Amino acid sequence: MSKETKLQVEAIKNGTVIDHIPAKVGIKVLKLFDMHNSAQRVTIGLNLPSSALGSKDLLKIENVFISEAQANKLALYAPHATVNQIENYEVVKKLALQLPERINNVFACPNSNCISHNEPVESSFKLSEKNNDIRLKCKYCEKVFARDVVTEIEA
């Protein structure tokens, strides 16, 4: 490996690597998986050089393996990210991201009049995609929102 292509972020022995996250999205993904509250070592790479994206974010969490269902939630933020499960420094499984049909109890509804804000119910959105445009429809108020509108709100 030449100096120019040397790893900028240390390899992990066991755990999960989420790579090819668009720049400035890594922190949102960190919070989505609650990694910032983990007792395990988390390595964060922000604005790393990428030939495909220009710049990218990267997350590595040791001794934690993200499920396929969790990885699919990632598709909202980074549909082209890669999720690799590592054992003994080797990639043992690559998770393909698919947009889930429904996402529950992750995001708050942007509609301040929605009953999900005042009733003891979990937020729930049905997802749809057309021409790389992801839309979320609230189960309760039935309003449709752009992905960016829903994912910018703290639940």
Swiss-Prot record:
Its cofactor is Zn(2+). It holds the Pfam family PyrI_C. InterPro entries: Asp_carbamoyltransf_reg_N (IPR020545), Asp_carbamoylTrfase_reg (IPR002801), Asp_carbamoyltrfase_reg_C (IPR020542), Asp_carbatrfase_reg_C_sf (IPR036792), Asp_carbatrfase_reg_N_sf (IPR036793). One of its GO terms (molecular function) is metal ion binding. The lineage of its organism: Bacteria, Pseudomonadati, Pseudomonadota, Gammaproteobacteria, Vibrionales. HAMAP family: Asp_carb_tr_reg. Contains catalytic and regulatory chains. GO terms for biological process: 'de novo' pyrimidine nucleobase biosynthetic process; pyrimidine nucleotide biosynthetic process. Zn(2+) binds at C109, C114, C138, C141. It comes from Vibrio cholerae serotype O1 (strain ATCC 39315 / El Tor Inaba N16961). Binds 1 zinc ion per subunit. SUPFAM superfamilies: Aspartate carbamoyltransferase, Regulatory-chain, C-terminal domain (SSF57825), Aspartate carbamoyltransferase, Regulatory-chain, N-terminal domain (SSF54893). GO terms for cellular component: aspartate carbamoyltransferase complex. NCBIfam families: ATCase_reg. This is Aspartate carbamoyltransferase regulatory chain. Involved in allosteric regulation of aspartate carbamoyltransferase. Belongs to the PyrI family. Keywords: Metal-binding, Pyrimidine biosynthesis, Zinc.
